[in-house]
Every structure is written in C-alpha cells, then in structure tokens.
C-alpha cells in the first residue's frame, strides 16, 4: 500500500513539474484584456490583425478588430 502511494505521489509531482516547465499554464492564461497598442491594418480583417499584432508585440498578444466611432481598428491586447 505504501509503495502504491509513493508511486502515485512521485508521478503526480513529475507531471506537475513537466507541466510547469513547458509553460502550458502561461499559454492558456492569455486573456486579451490589457491594451498594448494598434496595428495599421486597413481594412481590418481578423487574421491580418492577429498576425500584425503578433509580429509587432510578440507571441503572447492577440489582435482583434474593434469598432471605434465609425471605423474598425486593429487593437492588440495581452
């Protein structure tokens, strides 16, 4: 019984260590709420906006076309 518990604890700790070392929680934690800037995409298309934001601000950024008065602007958020 004790060997089984030790094995389960060791396996759980090993899996947590692997999960943290691969930065999976950071990748999933992208909330896209913090405004980082704008990208000059005209006309604003979601794919082009996202590509521009990633190229300008880094991989952890997501780009979204958002209405600003009468125009669509490409906003980059983290």
Curated annotation (Swiss-Prot):
Protein's UniProt keywords contain Signal: yes
Localization terms from the record: Secreted
Signal peptide: 1-29
Similarity remark: Belongs to the DEFL family.
Alphabetized UniProt keyword annotations: Antimicrobial, Disulfide bond, Fungicide, Plant defense, Secreted, Signal
UniProt superkingdom: Eukaryota
Covalent S-S links between cysteines: 44-65, 49-74, 53-76
Organism whose genome encodes this protein: Arabidopsis thaliana
Keyword DNA-binding part of the UniProt annotation: no
GO term, biological process aspect, one: killing of cells of another organism
Cellular component, GO annotation: extracellular region
Protein name: Putative defensin-like protein 202
């Amino acid at each position: 019984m004790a060997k089984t518990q030790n094995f389960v604890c060791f396996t759980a700790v090993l899996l947590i260590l692997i999960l943290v070392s691969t930065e999976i929680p950071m990748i999933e934690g992208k909330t896209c709420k913090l405004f980082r800037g704008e990208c000059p995409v005209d006309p604003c298309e979601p794919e082009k906006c996202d590509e521009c934001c990633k190229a300008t601000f880094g991989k952890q950024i997501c780009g979204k076309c958002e209405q600003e008065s009468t125009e669509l602007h490409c906003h980059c958020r983290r």
